[in-house]
Curated annotation (Swiss-Prot):
Name of the protein in question: Small ribosomal subunit protein uS7
Subunit-structure text: Part of the 30S ribosomal subunit. Contacts proteins S9 and S11.
Listed GO MF terms: rRNA binding; structural constituent of ribosome; tRNA binding
Cross-referenced PANTHER family: RIBOSOMAL PROTEIN S7
Protein function: One of the primary rRNA binding proteins, it binds directly to 16S rRNA where it nucleates assembly of the head domain of the 30S subunit. Is located at the subunit interface close to the decoding center, probably blocks exit of the E-site tRNA.
Keyword line: Ribonucleoprotein, Ribosomal protein, RNA-binding, rRNA-binding, tRNA-binding
InterPro entries, per database record: Ribosomal_uS7 (IPR000235), Ribosomal_uS7_bac/org-type (IPR005717), Ribosomal_uS7_CS (IPR020606), Ribosomal_uS7_dom (IPR023798), Ribosomal_uS7_dom_sf (IPR036823)
Annotated family: Belongs to the universal ribosomal protein uS7 family.
GO cellular component terms attached to this protein's record: small ribosomal subunit
UniProt entry tagged with the keyword Nucleotide-binding: no
GO biological-process terms attached to the record: translation
KW Manganese (keyword) present: no
Length: 156
């Protein structure tokens, strides 16, 4: 293993329209085959739909949705004496955000019918209202961590 310092973390540039770094991260996660323009169009269209339907700022709604989908705890597999234990660990802030965005995009893609922008807008609005598949995924993750609380002393 190389002994040089760690690789510096590259910071994302804020989104050109909303000036938000988290919106840029959503664009990056949504992007397929390097087609940033397509991903940006989907997200901006989704934000317009949110603005029309809620009458609020789309970034406010998106931030509320992100707060509802970011996990606080998760489980990690740890091998002890030939047995694998699911050990609950706290999620770092950076990973919380990444998981929230990743799950949101995943469940947006799984939604049926309509355009991608409509599906994303619906998923964001559902998450902001504490409903939807993304919020359920977070709750399931927390339940797993709670169920395996007995193995918390195996943390490293």
């Amino acid at each position: 293993m190389p002994r040089r310092g760690g690789i510096p973390k590259r910071d994302v540039l804020p989104d050109p329209i909303y000036g938000s770094k988290i919106a840029t991260k959503l664009v990056n996660q949504m992007m397929l085959d390097g087609k940033r323009g397509v991903a940006e169009k989907i997200i901006y269209d989704a934000f317009e739909i949110i603005k029309e339907k809620t009458g609020k700022s789309p970034l406010e709604v998106f931030d509320a949705a992100m707060k509802n989908v970011m996990p606080v705890l998760e489980v990690k597999a740890r091998r002890v004496g030939g047995a694998n234990y699911q050990v609950p660990v706290e999620v770092r802030a950076e990973r919380r955000q990444t998981l929230g965005i990743r799950w949101m995009v995943l469940f947006t893609r799984k939604r049926a019918g309509k355009s991608m922008a409509e599906k994303l807008a619906a998923e964001i609005m559902d998450a902001a209202n504490n409903t939807g598949a993304t919020v359920k995924k977070r709750e399931d993750t927390h339940k797993m961590a709670e169920a395996n609380k007995a193995f918390a002393h195996y943390r490293w």
